[in-house]
Curated annotation (Swiss-Prot):
Disordered: annotated span: 92-122
Subcellular location: Cytoplasm
Gene Ontology cellular component list: cytoplasm; plasma membrane
Chain intervals for the UniProt region annotation (Domain II): 83-119
Region (Domain IV, binds dsDNA): 337-456
Protein name: Chromosomal replication initiator protein DnaA
CDD domains named in the record: AAA, Bac_DnaA_C
Annotated gene: dnaA
Gene Ontology BP terms: DNA replication initiation; regulation of DNA replication
Amino acid sequence: MTASLWQQCLNRLQDELPSAEFSMWIRPLQAELSDNTLTLYAPNRFVLDWVRDKYLIRVNGIINELCGVDGPTLRFDIGNRPHPVAVARAPARGADPVNNSQKSWESKAEAKPEPNHKSNTNVNYTFENFVEGKSNQLARAAARQVADNPGGAYNPLFLYGGTGLGKTHLLHAVGNAIKERKQDAKVIYMHSERFVQDMVKALQNNAIEEFKRYYRSVDALLIDDIQFFANKERSQEEFFHTFNALLEGNQQIILTSDRYPKEINGVEDRLKSRFGWGLTVAIEPPELETRVAILMRKADENQIHLPDEVAFFIAKRLRSNVRELEGALNRVIANANFTGRAINIDFVREALRDLLALQEKLVTIDNIQKTVAEYYKIKLADLLSKRRSRSVARPRQLAMALAKELTNHSLPEIGDAFGGRDHTTVLHACRKIEQLKEESHDIKEDYSNLIRTLSS
């Protein structure tokens, strides 16, 4: 009964939800039916709260459609189900890693002697010192789940986003967490170019079998910047077979890239297809609150008092990535140590003079308007006009929201730059875009793409 009912629920949800959303939140759930109560087990508190908040009504609706008024009561818990149950449909790729993945992963180390593996993970990168915000919340949750259950539902895990947003930090954090939980776990972190170099060396030394055995005997393979495989046909061929071997053995794969898998040029379609077999998650540029939190944490690590107003001053002006923020703060701290001066806004303005000037030059309202018009293939004059058609109004609202986030102009100044509109119009546009980013994947993706374009 449990398998039949929950499998039908899974099938309905898989048909209704975007594949990434289904893989992220629904596929990891386990279920048990007892005393007319269907209990859904989530892997952690974060997933439980999210599913209960976002999907409770729909799951109850499906149960009522299938069972009528006498259907089971739905409840949630954290942990593993007491008995086996159905799992979601998955793309055909051998054994489904959702079932028995933990058991096979735990026992594989004892199965046969393996090569000596050096992990290369940086112990300074952990989940504890990763600053979480709306921009990276899903990526961190997915990475945490992989660390707790390697080889499970999120395999492979593919993280993508611009430079300096925390992808590498999460790779190391997963590797460190796996090794902390199981000290003899064979975890390898590497840049994709290292894989290429190792393969070339193996070919030169007639040691390709040793190369294969080394990479196919790991518990977790963490590869950074997979886009560097582009146009390296022999490396792609070998990685294709390594990828398949690891997934068949329920061994975890995590990949990062600066772009969505299908947008990676020079990589074979069969590889790009496999990159999306598990879960693909974007990491966005950090929002203001996260940027401030990053600066405050970095200052604490350096035992430096950073006034709130100074943190906000820096965060409002440097928006592109975490690396840029940390570099700016390091410069401020160094200048303060050299001069003995107190850290305040005037001092920061002086210490970061060239950086702030460059940022203000790069992102202007005029530049935002031209970029948005080009992105949506509309005339700039229409963007600034009084036209209210959806094809023009929505890009205009996006441009206003971007101007508020990426520049230091006031709402009246932004409104004036958009054909003399009132500041309340700008405020409405910003609120509308925030709402649409929560409701529409397309709007969220467009906004993120424009942020990346304007911040690069």
